[in-house]
Amino acid sequence: MIRLLTGVALLAMPAAAMGQEAVDDSDTAVVLQMTAPIPAEEIVVTGAGSLRPSGGDSVQTTAVLRDLQPGFGTRIENRLRDEAGIVQFRRSDGRSAHPTSQGVTLRGLGGNASSRALVTLDGVPQADPFGGWVPWSAYDAINLGGIVIARGGGSGADGPGALAGTIGLYSTMTDGVTASAAYGSRDSWDASASVGGNLGNGQVAVDGRYSRGDGFVPVASGQRGAVDRAAPYEQGGLGLRLRFDAGDDSRIEASLRGFSDRRDRGTDFTTSKTDGVDASLRVVHDPAGAAQWLALAYVEVRDFDSGFASVAAGRNSVAPALFQRVPATGLGARFELRPAISGDNPLRIGTDWRRTTGRTEEDFFFSGVTPGRHRIAGGSSDTVGAFAEWSAGDAGDGLLWTLSGRVDHWWLGEGYRLERNIGGSTITNLRFAARQGWEGSGRAGVRWTSDALSLRAAAYRGWRLPTLNELYRPFRVGAEVTTANEMLEPERLWGGEVGVDWASDGTKLSATLFANHLSNAIANVTLAPNLNQRQNLDAIDSKGIEVSAEQRIGPATLRATYAFTDAKVDASGMASTLDGRRPAQIAKHGGSVSLRSNDDGPFGGFATLRYIGKQNEDDRGLLVLGDALTLDAGLSWRLNKAVSIEARGENLFDELVPAAISASGVVERATPRTLWVGARASF
């Protein structure tokens, strides 16, 4: 905490100075930029393919990130770290982290790499259909108009995956041409382009991005051996969006995008490859003062390959341990209706369906580079739900309340796990009976607003179905083996929060107290040395406070966020050794301070200071990841209306950010200091 407060002071002093300088010469002052949240009623996202915000959006705790220009090493997952309380399973980003570790959650509901927060792109769920991790690199190629972060569970419209909250990505359609190119440390390149314009009675836009780099050595200095080397990456994506007016305030939108992600973990036999193709089609009827509706259908196809290595003591030799391929498919559809009852259509009703299928195909028990055994495991899941939400009152002044409910029926198809010696006998041939059940979720919220002050409160219930990965796939990391558990039950959340907001004359303050009880929480439980199993814990209890403050200072805005999270495991039986411990990968303290310019002068920039506290690497708290304070900053100079040049830096302190630690004490680090320089153009 002392390190964070010191960093706040460092940013605040130049901010105050800039506020003085701006009075004399605001057109030429070099100022810093920040990303600020905006109230739900101000959100306007072009081409998002969704209905206008409802009254219920104003009751939920919401933050919005804007200024999401791609390129120059900008990563969506790192921008999310600007908001305290958003927790990603690993501190490393999509250039070096293993793809299966990139889950996301909120409010201390962690300890598991599967996402407990729902991530959507224009309303389409984005978590991997098999594993629940999020392919963050896929969104760097998309021209995003904003990210809406809704905290807390129980949202009927978002679906059952929104256990801890929803992170909604919203794309926008380019009108003209924009492009950027940058060169960075370790021979890194990052290029992006977007082209869009009118097509008949509609619009068309094409977005693309390519990035690559030689990478850095993941193992911390002083612990490296002969097998350790830099971990290169190569990533790219291409997207096509079409939008046509269908008359009578209706439009049809189609989206097709694909991405490719190649990474390495810094030793031989650890290359991973992820390829994906997504398509969606929607029809939106959104007149003001009349009935509104939306129909959406989508498909997601993923193909993931990864190698895993076994490194000998002393790190002087390495051998293949496992090769894995995971093909998976997600299908879904949604329909929402807002009848014309009165005012701004206070009633929302709808239904949705989601299906996931996938399997893991693995080769292991290597002799040299030849595998001796093959395993295939997988299954399918379906969820069908219906929801309703009613909002009443005045979002701008007085009392506003909302009540939502949802009921879901879920199915787990027959699962399977087959293991055999390659070219020989069958070792395991298991079939797991199909299961099904019903779950309910809901949310009640109220907000009272008077002039600059708002008070709010909410209570909610949500749930999450185990992923196919958690149910059927055992895995190994080094000497650590984790077995699957086909009998896992759905996770269920009860929670509540109270908060206060104040806004006046360029100043915004917000504070939220929350408490959550997650029963049946799925975690990796240690059974014996080097042997774990996924199990339902009795519960994870998490309570804490989230605070944000924002101040306009001349042509700049200063924003700070802080989250205190007190999370503990409630466990018995085989997991009793975890009782009272903090969940793995959850820090008690986290915060950020950002400063960004917000005018149209020729000079601009940003500075973001992030702090993350100590956290446990493992379920028993035997391995601890130290805290870290990092600084990102950048400056831009607009040469004319079309062209600007920029320089950016990541982790300018070159802080050691521990991302993982093995049982033998070997520390994996996140991104070290990285510098970028390049140009942007728009026509």
Outline where the language-model segments fall.
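N-terminal periplasmic accessory domains that precede
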Residues: L32, I76-R79, Q102-G108, T120-D122, ...
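N-terminal periplasmic "start-of-domain" segments of outer-membrane beta-barrel proteins
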Residues: P39-T74, H98-G103, A117
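Extracytoplasmic beta-strand/coil segments of soluble accessory domains associated
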Residues: E77-V124
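Short acidic/polar hinge/loop motifs at secondary-structure boundaries
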Residues: V124-R151
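Periplasmic-side early beta-strands and strand-to-turn transitions of outer-membrane beta-barrels
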Residues: S155, G168, D175-T178, A182, ...
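Outer-membrane beta-barrel signature, preferentially recognizing the C-terminal barrel domain
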Residues: T271-D286, L322-G330, G378-T383, N429-T449, ...
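Surface-exposed extracellular loop regions of Gram-negative outer-membrane beta-barrel proteins
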Residues: V301-D305, T357-F366, H409-T426, A434, ...
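Gram-negative outer-membrane beta-barrel transporters
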Residues: G393-W401, D408-H409, A503, K508-S510, ...
